[in-house]
Amino acid sequence: MYFPIFLAKKYDILALCDLDEKLFKNITPILIPHYHKDFKKNIKKLVDKNIYFIIVLNFKRLGYPTINDIENDLINDVLKDYTNYSLAYWTYNDTSKLEIQNFINQNGNLEKSIIHREEFSKAQYLSNQNFKYHIFIENYVNQDYIDLFVSNDRIYIQDGFKRQKKNADYPKISDFSDNHYTYKSRGGVGFGDFTIIGHDLKDGGGAAYAVAIHMTNARKKIANVHHFVSDSIAGRENPGGKFIEALNHMIRFIDNNAVFEGIGINTYRDLHKRKHFPGLPINKKLGIINHIEQIANIM
């Protein structure tokens, strides 16, 4: 089972909604709620498609909804009559046993998981609880800690996207992960990542000097990300022209190499044929769609 993690923002949710529904037999999105004007509307899109997902209750970052916010605006509102989801709690170095106990005791009708973002001091206590999954972000917790937990509910998350400060700095290709190939041999029941966004989960961005298309290409043993960058890398003007430059590089690569083509790639092909710039948020959405399709294709 594949567990991609991302912010529940407009284009991230739209990427999920645009995927072939059959893929969700093997995919469980983990969503970090994010306040914006379409907050509830976006979650409702997943409800309307009956997509199973996991909601993170306690992502501690300024401006993000609190546990009470999520209770009031989602669990007791948009999700009041929806049962096809579960909850997860994100551990920090200062997470207390009382917090975990409160998480366990509340919303008793919903299954619950723990996301180990930082190592919890009372690991044995966590291991003894009846959680659906123990989800480990491997970049931040070590194997000795992971080994304290039983293997029949482990999910291994790796942040494979190597974010650069500037689009112009991306190499032509970078390794992403072999997690999809190795997780079972390490006793996992699932694996995941932060798609092509990365664990940094930036809240926004402005016009870039260079435009980049990040295209995942997954094979049996490893997934790579190809970075197609516009030829023009100076100034913030003409993002549409820069997108077409990057798209030309991408299509040329696809035409000459073996790449699985799903909805994401086919949409890029259509944009190339029409020489159309859909906007940078759509470029992001298509990159997420392709990433998930690529991973699903080799599972």
Task: Give the ranges of each region predicted by the language model.
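Long, charge-rich C-terminal accessory regions
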Residues: S127-N266
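Conserved, mostly hydrophobic/aromatic
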Residues: L16, P29
